[in-house]
Amino acid sequence: YEGTYPLPEAQLDRFLLKVLIDYPDTQFEAWIVKAVASKAGGSGLSAGDVQQVCTPEDILNAQAEAAAVQAVEPVVDYAVNLVRATRQHSAISLGAGTRGAISLVRVAKSYALLEGRGYITPSDVKRAVLPVLRHRVQLSPEIAITGQTVDDMLNAVVRTVEAPRG
């Protein structure tokens, strides 16, 4: 569901990720319903239960650490080639732009940092493809009516672009 007014492609491209979030499991959904329905008015959930887990400085430091993760030229080229392949794939009517490649590398750096590495790998880039590119490409109408998804086509693109070795 896109909401009342879908965003234009130029605005969608400015979002770093599109993460798909599913419904909660039955037990958690029941807990939510009970918590909210037991209160008169409002959401029924107390903001007082929220605890700070990091400071703004922590976030800035993490961003700086992620930016410092090394991205060697062959892996950056791989990210660029993946994005360029979205523009050439027959099932995709609108491919990703340069921001998509930049975002692939940035998210790959974050993945590497979270795994304790100071460098990105082609696997980090592959892992980033779906959340980074799924909102940046559009399927051709002929493919969209077949029930295939953007994720299906992005996975097909990944299979066609050779990853660097070594």
Task: State where each predicted segment sits.
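Residue-level detector of secondary-structure boundary/capping sites
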Residues: 6, 70, 144-148
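Short, surface-exposed, polar/charged, turn-prone segments marking secondary-structure boundaries
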Residues: 18-24, 46-50, 81, 147, ...
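Conserved AAA+ ATPase small/helical "lid" subdomain
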Residues: 44-101
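C-terminal engagement/docking regions of AAA+ P-loop ATPases
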Residues: 77, 86-166
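Hydrophobic aliphatic residues
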Residues: 11, 33-37, 83, 129, ...
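Alpha-helix boundary/capping and short turn/kink residues
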Residues: 23-26, 71-72, 118-119, 163
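Canonical AAA+ ATPase core
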Residues: 1-69, 109-114
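An amphipathic alpha-helix signature
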Residues: 26, 30-34, 76, 80, ...
